[in-house]
UniProtKB/Swiss-Prot annotation:
This is Large ribosomal subunit protein uL1. Keywords: Repressor, Ribonucleoprotein, Ribosomal protein, RNA-binding, rRNA-binding, Translation regulation, tRNA-binding. It comes from Allorhizobium ampelinum (strain ATCC BAA-846 / DSM 112012 / S4). One of its GO terms (cellular component) is cytosolic large ribosomal subunit. PANTHER family: 54S RIBOSOMAL PROTEIN L1, MITOCHONDRIAL, LARGE RIBOSOMAL SUBUNIT PROTEIN UL1M. NCBIfam families: rplA_bact. The gene is rplA. Binds directly to 23S rRNA. The L1 stalk is quite mobile in the ribosome, and is involved in E site tRNA release. The keyword RNA-binding applies. GO terms for biological process: regulation of translation; translation.
Amino acid sequence: MAKLAKRIQKIREGVDPTKLVALSDAISMVKERAVAKFDETIEIAMNLGVDPRHADQMVRGVVNLPNGTGRDVRVAVFARGAKADEARAAGAEVVGAEDLVEIVQGGKIDFDRCIATPDMMPLVGRLGKVLGPRGMMPNPKVGTVTMDVAGAVKASKGGAVEFRVEKAGIIHAGIGKASFEAKALEENIKAFADAVIKAKPAGAKGNYVKRVAISSTMGPGVKIDPSSVTA
């Protein structure tokens, strides 16, 4: 336990929780402190000036990160016939209709992202209580209810990241791995921030992007000057 506390203290050295730093410096600090024995995920958290309890202040969307996420994303597709074949050919790991609904209702969810053709939604709607809390419910607004299942599968595996503001007005997402080059992380972060800004709801008043921070899975958060992300 003493060794763990010492390691945590060492990782946190040089990180001032009250100081805002430029994006490039923040990336360097986070990468230097990603010392776990696995390839840590680099995560971004954005505090927004919205209250998602109001429908006109909800923020959600999807962004294709230019350099991918570094994750091996397992995709499930609810489809029948030719569209099911199309999904398999595109690389979807799990494809089905009524049979897949039964599997998910039984508690087996061995996928990270879920796609459905429009005709399947009355069936998939039964899974709202299971998929909804996990942020996996297919939604046409983020391109996961579509007839272009091949395109959706490829996007999911190629770096598509969904985002949705939480109750406290925070959006967070994984935007790469510690092994990524600094420039690749910077490009991903700016692409993510740009998508969040473009998704600004009509009901948002005042300062929209209030705070931004990045961190690795096991490392401390580093606060970023919002202007270096949103410029």
